[in-house]
Amino acid sequence: VKLYPEGDASARFSLRGAGVLYFYCNCHGLMKAPDFRTATRRTSPQKIHLREPDEGDREQVMAYREEFLAINSRMDGTSALDKYADFDAWLAQLRKLKDPATTPAGLVPATEYLALDEHEHLVGMTNLRHRLNDYLLTYGGHIGYSVRPSERKNGYATQMLRLTLEKAKERGIEKVRICCDHYNVASAKTIRANGGVLEDEQFDSSDGTLTQRYWIQNK
């Protein structure tokens, strides 16, 4: 469990219960971290826009990463941000992934985007793969995305997917494969809201999950 120490604490620990609550203890007493499940929900989502990350996004991106680690949540569509404690190394990897000449073996060229609200606050990330390999055709798709835990249920996922589809169209991708786990009802709803048509479900023996595979006509 991710800890958030403050000051020169003599003792630190965390508790996780049904409420997904995280605590730390320091010399000033017991403190309670935010419960992302009860974050303020907006009656209507702010408009968002996409842009590629740059050096000025260090603080926001790393804070985004910490939110996911704190609740042990998957960071889909982040180009493996969970594996990068070093922002500069992550940014360098994005540049390699975008250029077909430097894309690592076994991967496909892809572009990473930040989803930012009207105040330039980072609410999500989305990743557009420029083409499919066999694995992506079956389990991953052209697009992966995630919404910041504290910004969930604000309607951002539907906007993010729509905007990423526009980026795909700019690249000439007229038929977009997109996948989600069978149990992820919210993600399936987002895909259908953007024109997704379910083709079938595939069992992924590598992790024991059932994957729904959709196509979106993107002409």
Stretches found by the model and what they are:
Residues I178-A188:
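Conserved beta-strand-loop-alpha-helix junction that forms the acyl-donor binding cleft
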Residues V1-L3, E201-Q202:
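Beta-strand-rich interaction surfaces with strong enrichment in secreted/lumenal proteins
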Residues A168-C179:
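Conserved GNAT acetyl-CoA-binding A-motif
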Residues G144-V147, K153-E166, E170, K189-A193:
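Conserved acetyl-CoA-binding loop-helix of GNAT-fold acetyltransferases
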Residues R41-H142, K167, D207-K219:
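GNAT-family acyltransferases
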